[in-house]
Amino acid sequence: MAKEIKFAEEARRSLEAGVNKLADTVKVTLGPKGRNVIIDKKFGSPLITNDGVTIAREIELEDAYENMGAQLVKEVATKTNDVAGDGTTTATLLAQAIIREGLKNVAAGANPMILKKGIQKAVDVAVEELKNTSQKVEGKEAIAQIGAVSAADEEIGQLIADAMEKVGNDGVITVEESKSMGTTLDVVEGMQFDRGYLSAYMVTDTEKMEAVFNDPYILLTDKKINTVQEILPVLEQIVQQGRKLLIIAEDIEGEALATLVLNKLRGTFECVAVKAPGFGDRRKAMLDDIAVLTGATVISDELGYDLKTATIDMLGTARTVKVDKDNTTIVEGAGDSSAIKDRVNQIKRQIEETTSDFDKEKLQERLAKLSGGVAVIQVGAATETELKERKLRIEDALNATRAGVEEGMVAGGGASLVHVIPAVEALLETTEGDERTGVKIIRRALEEPLRQIAANAGLEGSVIVEKVMSSEKGIGFDALTEKYVNMIEAGIVDPTKVTRSALQNAASVSAMLLTTEGAIVDIKSDEPSMPGGMGGGMPMM
């Protein structure tokens, strides 16, 4: 296919036009007085949101050159979202500022490759300074502040802090849509997995249709159980003790299942059977997790164990087991606490080593089930449009809170970036030429988030930036009350990881765009598409 090529200034200006179209759409959402953007959807109601990456993902421009520029900045937002889960609007805004200032200097004759070196040096210094000023997130109040600032809603911040308090920092917190109008928090204690009972006849509570056992034995195996003879020896030992039994196996079918149900109906012996969670290697790992949690031994050919020779010592126990048609929950397993701790540390190491996002997510779920539990935030709203917007805000706030717990927090509202400017300015003494110009580009870009927050509040950004720069560290501008305050004391904080990632990703992509000297796109074909074939029916007479 034939290509069209643009060079030098013409190419860079076309790319910049695309960058500006995307960034101008996203940046109106920044700050406590930022607005929303409405996005048309082919199916369902339009989406109203202030989430930077959601807006960026929807933007495709007609002009191919402009679209390339937009896609590059979209990558800044997406990468920041992947790493930190929030800060996508800040990242987009920083990228726009670096590209704007950089292209001015390239047009004036600066060498882009040397500019890039200066930009990188300045970013490294700024990031180091951010880490030095970062404060540890300790206590429920600090966690609530990060969530509240990200979602612009104190209630959401409090909800996330409650969830983290109940399931721990490693716990899984999921966000789901509620059928009611209110937003609530449900906490599942212990280990839960998505496998329910194999027969409804096994329930102990017919009203709730669930089986609840206190202090039962737990039999774990990766085999199929087809006949009751396979497990008869161990069943006889359990019946003698008058205890109940939870069986977790690859499957239980035919005569084995029928016999267990029959004994339950006759009142001889109470048992509930479920399939093992997961598939393949993940199933083996999850069975091992349950074994460690409950103090059981997985009866498996690989380990040299057979069901027929299984003994009571191989079974695990737990304070309570609850099984409904979809889920099994094990609360307070009787496993050895040091073995559980070792297993948790092993999973943490696997999380650090894996490169797959899917594997990381599954490992984090396993970690949560072993170490804390699962909290579910049920999001409610009056309309579907409000529900979608609220759910996105809560997801962002949750990501921001996790990032804060991980790397600490800095003053929010763009103040932390303004306060690292003196450290960046110190570089001007040790650099020269175009490298020095690169440092100046970052120095100017660091003001941009605060300028935009002020502009979105209908105020003059330059005056506010000047005032914050001349104030001591930690002082910033609260756009909601329009006062200068100590940002951390006022609870206006950003996670260090979010601010750092936004700056690093913006500088990385922007510096690459500045070094562009040619741009190539496909030439659009003006040929009309092929006409449709003749319709069916009788030919004309």
Swiss-Prot record:
Q: Which GO terms describe its biological process?
A: protein refolding
UniProt EC number: 5.6.1.7
Q: Where in the cell is it found?
A: Cytoplasm
Q: What class of enzyme is it?
A: isomerase
| Chief place of localization | cytoplasm
Record carries keyword Zinc-finger = no
Which keywords does the record carry?
ATP-binding, Chaperone, Cytoplasm, Isomerase, Nucleotide-binding
Pfam families named among the record's database cross-references? Cpn60_TCP1 (PF00118)
Quaternary state and interactors = Forms a cylinder of 14 subunits composed of two heptameric rings stacked back-to-back. Interacts with the co-chaperonin GroES.
Please describe what this protein does.
Together with its co-chaperonin GroES, plays an essential role in assisting protein folding. The GroEL-GroES system forms a nano-cage that allows encapsulation of the non-native substrate proteins and provides a physical environment optimized to promote and accelerate protein folding.
Family matches, as HAMAP family: CH60 (MF_00600)
Tell me the protein family, please. Answer: Belongs to the chaperonin (HSP60) family.
Protein name, entry field: Chaperonin GroEL
